[in-house]
């Protein structure tokens, strides 16, 4: 169970469930096909059934580092990938080592993928969008984030509130447009995809057990999020 600061909400979050086939596996031609394939549920949050101005119910909100915890609310956005609504962190506290995080209420899982559509809009200290996985609490999780001020994508682990960088890719991260950030992970291996192209390949064993997925920002970043997807890996 994820831990952190909860915000009360009276309306259940707009959780759209989509069932997809289990992760396909390449097999040798002579290997028999199993008679049954277990389906794996992918949980997608579109945020479209909630009235703007409310936090999505069921999410757990926390903050790594200092400064204010943050304020996550649903907002309307005409250009949303799945209109009309998105999720945004709207507290513009400029504390540099401040990382607001919103952990989704999906069941914890160990292997699979977490992805989100994100639009970095503004921020003077930072302009970041991130996804977390194997999230234990606000001080312990894996993170990949893109930064439109630095033009890079990075991979970290956060342990006991300390953020440690493991990998970096330098390339264009454009403000004001929608992007896709996805992390596929299995055992100690993680692959980070930015706008559909793999940019980071990393191994680490800091967190090996199950945890939740979610989204993340830094400092005064004003970033929009949509179509947050948690997809456990099938057997």
Residue ranges and their predicted role:
Residues 34-36, 207-235:
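Ligand-recognition surfaces built from glycine- and aromatic
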Residues 160-180:
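Short, aromatic/His-centered strand-loop micro-motif at the edge of beta-sheets
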Residues 54-87:
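Extracellular glycan-recognition surfaces and repeat-rich motifs
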Residues 47, 114-116, 178-186, 190-192:
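Short tryptophan-centered beta-strand motifs in secreted/extracellular beta-sheet-rich domains
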Residues 193-212:
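Short, solvent-exposed beta-strand-to-loop segments that form ligand-recognition rims
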